[in-house]
């Protein structure tokens, strides 16, 4: 798994400015950002009485939504600076050092959520991660992933061409360098693990996959 800690330690202080801004290269990626976070919460409303694990807490924006709506949350975040900011926002939430392939928590969960983070794993690591997360999830529990994904090769090609035409070169480099998958590649992993799933499109980049353990 690639080590992005230095990058995110540097980005931590300006991350919220990026996601909430309406005038930067990433504006369309984070379009309907709050709606996306709320949609994740909505997807696990039936699991509110259980325990929720959030991976890739970042600065705690999704965590804050979950806490305000009464969820019991444990957060995982590898970046020291991101953890610091999230803990300042949410001092009562347990946020520990870890990542998708290393969860130092001896508990099981009724829901596992992640937003704008799963793309840091390559496809093989995603397979390993979902298999690993399955071991922490109670029967009928849910895994919810919100991230940039592509519905087809043609859609990806057209989107990258548009980004290049718009001269959004930082975004273009990000889209090429990180591991943004085709939706079917991720849903196939869930199918092999015996999960049912739903898919929702939030903007031209971001989709939400909500997968239920034992749903098949």
UniProtKB/Swiss-Prot annotation:
Superkingdom per UniProt: Bacteria
UniProt entry keywords in alphabetical sequence: Methyltransferase, S-adenosyl-L-methionine, Transferase
Residues noted as binding S-adenosyl-L-methionine in the record, renumbered to the chain: 56, 77
GO biological process: methylation
The keyword Transferase appears for this protein: yes
EC number(s) given by UniProt: 2.1.1.-
Xref: InterPro entries: Methyltransf_25 (IPR041698), SAM-dependent_MTases_sf (IPR029063), Uncharacterised_MeTfrase_YrrT (IPR023553)
Record's keyword annotation contains Metal-binding: no
CDD domains membership: AdoMet_MTases
SUPFAM superfamilies: S-adenosyl-L-methionine-dependent methyltransferases
GO MF annotation: an example: S-adenosylmethionine-dependent methyltransferase activity
Main EC class the enzyme belongs to: transferase
Task performed by this protein: Could be a S-adenosyl-L-methionine-dependent methyltransferase.
Family named by the database record: Belongs to the methyltransferase superfamily. YrrT family.
PANTHER family in the record: TRANS-ACONITATE 2-METHYLTRANSFERASE-RELATED
Identification of the protein by name: Uncharacterized methyltransferase Clos_1076
Organism: Alkaliphilus oremlandii (strain OhILAs)
